[in-house]
């Protein structure tokens, strides 16, 4: 999604949101990520300006004080950015890939089932279409944000094909977009 993303070329406009819209977004975030509720006022303080940065390909990035927090495509569900995930690692369930998969994940490849079932990888129970943080064997922070394409049980049974779709990874265009004022 952000492989060839450049903030100077891909950003269309930036809109400051009304309080009523912010409340709706906060409710949507709580529905999507129930764990985030007690931390939401810390992540999105009431007095700070909340803006939506609109980009090409119908991508919207939610910012507070210029800090990129969440993104979505076509009015879909929100995904946390890796910078937010590094500050609050508990907001998403984790899956762990083995060391051999790291370079492929960091180049934007989807996570294949064998990379989640081999020694060194840890596959935690999760349903299909769940947003997850991808951790790496021996590393502290998440490498990417992904969406489960199969349930954890199906990944173990089938052990072929794409297990998790890579949505946003370290050093992609969104990662290089530091802040947006």
Curated annotation (Swiss-Prot):
Record key words, sorted: Cell cycle, Cytoplasm, Growth regulation, Transcription, Transcription regulation
Classification via Gene3D superfamilies: 3.10.400.20
Any single Pfam family the record assigns to this protein: Pre-PUA
Recorded GO MF terms: RNA binding
Subcellular location: Cytoplasm
GO biological process, one term: formation of translation preinitiation complex
Superkingdom of origin organism: Eukaryota
Entry's family note: Belongs to the MCTS1 family.
Descriptive protein name: Malignant T-cell-amplified sequence 1-B
